[in-house]
Amino acid sequence: MSSSLEDQLVSYVRHHAKDGILLDTNILLLLLVARFKPDLVGGKRLEIYGLRDAELLTAYVKNFSRILTTSHVLAETSNFARQIMKGRTQASFFAWLHPLFCIDSEDSLVQCAIQGRDIDGGLFVRLGLTDSGLAASAKDGRLLLTSDLDLHIAVASEGAPSINFTHMREAAGLL
């Protein structure tokens, strides 16, 4: 990994480990699928990723005390997961996912409330509801990890902390 990116990633951990890390839909989906059934990584909706990508993601996210998300990301992640899995696998996955998404516990994902008035109209037009909501949440100083270059650029251009997972993959020699 390039030393400047590695230094930046370490700095982000130092500054955001207690507060947590905000994940976009594709990153959250990759993380959850890799934890539940790693052999699905590389399949539908996760075609561009391999197990080493999932390992890189998991290793980095472990540095943070909690995973932050929004209700929009949870809805998209749930819908995408339904496209990936069927039958008993899907039922087992959603039974496992329910407490993470819906029950307030130490292990559950932390939802960041986004008010409609906080979403920038221009970003909404360019990025849609889910990503403009993530951008609004990141403006509060939350560290965002995304695979979406447009979202990464939008957040970083506002001076908010953002990591592009593709850059991490490139630096780790996975692309």
Language-model features: locations:
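Acidic, PIN/NYN-like endoribonuclease modules and their adjacent C-terminal/linker elements
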Residues: 1-18, 36, 119-123, 127, ...
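Short, well-structured N-terminal submotif of metal-dependent ribonuclease cores
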Residues: 1-69, 84-89, 170-174
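Acidic active-site catalytic centers that drive phospho-/nucleotidyl reactions
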Residues: 24, 131, 148
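Alpha-helix capping/helix-boundary segments
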Residues: 27-28, 73, 134, 150-152
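A short acidic (Asp/Glu
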Residues: 31-35, 78-82, 154-158
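Short alpha-helical "patches" and their helix-cap loops
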Residues: 43-48, 89-101, 146-155
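PIN-domain endoribonuclease scaffold, especially VapC-family toxins
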Residues: 52-127, 132-133, 173-174
